[in-house]
Amino acid sequence: MKKSFVFAFWMVLSGLVSAQTIEVSGEYQGRVLWDADTVRLVGDVFIEPDEGGEACLIVERGTWVIAEGYYRITIHNGSFYALGADKIPITFTASDTTDFYNPEVISGWRGIRLVSDQSNNQDTVFMEYCRVSYGKVITGAPEGERFGAGLEVRNKKYCYFAHCVFTQNRCGHNGNSPNSGGGGGMYVVNPGTLLVEHCVFHDNYAWWGASISAGGLRHFTVRNCEFYNNSGHYGTALDMHVGELSLSDSGPQVYNNYIHGNHGNAAYLGWEGVGLLHDNIIVNNEGYSPVLGTTAPNYSHYYNNTIANNRSEAFIGGGGSGIWTNGQQKIYNNIFYGNTGIYFERMDPSHADPTAYNNCHLFPNGVIGNYDIYADPLFVNPTGGLGPEYDHATDAAHWSLLEGSPCLNVGATNMGTFCPETDFLGQPRVVNGRIDLGAIEAPDWDGVEEQVAKSCAYPNPGKDVLHIETTLENAIVMVYDLNGKKMWEQQVNGSPTNIATEDWPSGMYFWQVVSAGTTTLAETGKWMKE
């Protein structure tokens, strides 16, 4: 436990509460601190400014906030700080999840609501190493109560989310328009700046924005995140309604994300103006509509994305992407592979005038670009089929390129300031003045002697230990997380590795086997930490 003895005290003026286990409900003013092993939410909590104009909730690392009913935490005209640590996260959840998946039954809890009256305030939101689960919006909820099952944020100056997990949050279906509700994991509207990085969203549901639904954005970045097994209709990973952006606005940036195995349109991009999507891996999703969709006069840049084995069965569009409304998108250096749609394997250009250069497709249809390649890109190990049913860790899929791939060193470099600096794994994007296609830059194969090896990682998935075995003599084994951080490096000679992983965060990792003393990449694969 966090403390070796039990004590409790209450300071009325500051709202300070500290104990092993505390119960909270009702109205508070000013600064409130929750520093306890467990905070039991036994009623709605409402925090508003004190006479000095301050309102703030601070949750200390290691705290479990458990709702004992369908209750909600609301901060009105104030800030929110929940800063956990790598091995000491903060958890927000519900004690009773009976009938949670019945959209008409009140169950779970009502999540966190952070609302300011005006967008020009100084209120901020910081969440780091937090886990938010079992937030719920029921079908038939009153208007104004239909957004943000896990988290709802309105009119905050700065919002920062890092190393957080949003899972098992559900928004009931209250209509088909964006105004009818959405945001299973989080709903954010009119932030001054929104940054989401190194977060995981899985098993959330909403008709609009199962993971993230956001609107009124000017400075918005989602990077190095993972989205999987979310369900809905529009934007199972991202649903963004931005409005008109001027050239002075930075525009949305979505890069280095892994979006896979979702049930529904992966990303719905409703912004007007310039946005940048690059170095994302978007694979094995399925939905009524295309994997990517834009419905506003849109001038976004799509660079070096790998969009593969997605399935769009019922909408007139592409399994790869659909551009539905007038726009002049820039589409460079992407790989479209194995996607299915009613008409297009790649992008439906019916209502747009995009500029496309140096993309790779299995066959010509949809958007036709300059210097396109129509060939198998030769991935190291693509998934074995279309849709979420083939999105399994045991498939050891890896979307880097083999030696001999037609996608090596043929990418366009005329993107100006929009040219990405790094690839999906954080490696330099431009090598010797040349760029590969797709999300992962391959090693420089020039002058490398071909080597053949057989390697495997087990158990997969695993928990506390990872073994990597290879037939390559004098080999070096390296393991990276999704952000390109090297977690392990070891030289092996015939014996399998014995890597202790109990302290590693759950998620996806990539392993590589190289020949010692060279840069020869012999084999690579994927490993899932439970």
Model-derived regions, located:
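Bacterial Sec-dependent N-terminal signal peptides
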Residues: 1-21, 460, 527
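Beta-strand/loop edge motif enriched in small/polar residues
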Residues: 20-271, 284-288, 311-313, 319, ...
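Acidic glycine-/aspartate-rich tracts in secreted/extracellular proteins
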Residues: 63, 85-87, 96-99, 136, ...
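Predominantly extracellular beta-rich ligand-binding scaffolds that present long acidic/polar faces
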Residues: 240-398
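C-terminal accessory segments
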Residues: 371-441
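Low-complexity, Pro/Thr/Ser/Gly/Ala-rich linker/spacer regions in secreted
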Residues: 441-453
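C-terminal outer-membrane/trafficking sorting elements
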Residues: 450-458, 462-530
